[in-house]
From Swiss-Prot:
Belongs to the universal ribosomal protein uS11 family. NCBIfam families: PRK05309.1, uS11_bact. The lineage of its organism: Bacteria, Pseudomonadati, Pseudomonadota, Betaproteobacteria, Burkholderiales. It comes from Cupriavidus necator (strain ATCC 17699 / DSM 428 / KCTC 22496 / NCIMB 10442 / H16 / Stanier 337). GO terms for molecular function: rRNA binding; structural constituent of ribosome. GO terms for cellular component: ribonucleoprotein complex; ribosome. It holds the Pfam family Ribosomal_S11. This is Small ribosomal subunit protein uS11.
Amino acid sequence: MAKGPNNAARARKKVKKNVADGIAHVHASFNNTIITITDRQGNALSWATAGGQGFKGSRKSTPFAAQVAAENAGRVAQDQGIKNLEVRIKGPGPGRESAVRALNALGIKIAIIEDVTPIPHNGCRPPKRRRI
């Protein structure tokens, strides 16, 4: 019978980086909000999701859930030394604005807010209309 990896091999110590500038990637879908804070090269420093903060079901897709997730990701990034952020927002979800406000409220200086939502040049056919 094969054994899984033991806890000593799996648990790695977090290395504290000292990065002043970073990029906050906010992915706001209709169902969830994912915030990833990276350095300039794209290496992830911290991340948080609305679902990971304890919100389940339709509560994940609220602005408050996005705010809580952004606060958590921002606090961990501040521990890594982040002081300035560029914010790149992707998606049409309800957590777009509240995530940016939460990062700003933490005292992190936001230099640029950029919308990088992918827009098709008549690509794939969209899903059919909902009938309720």
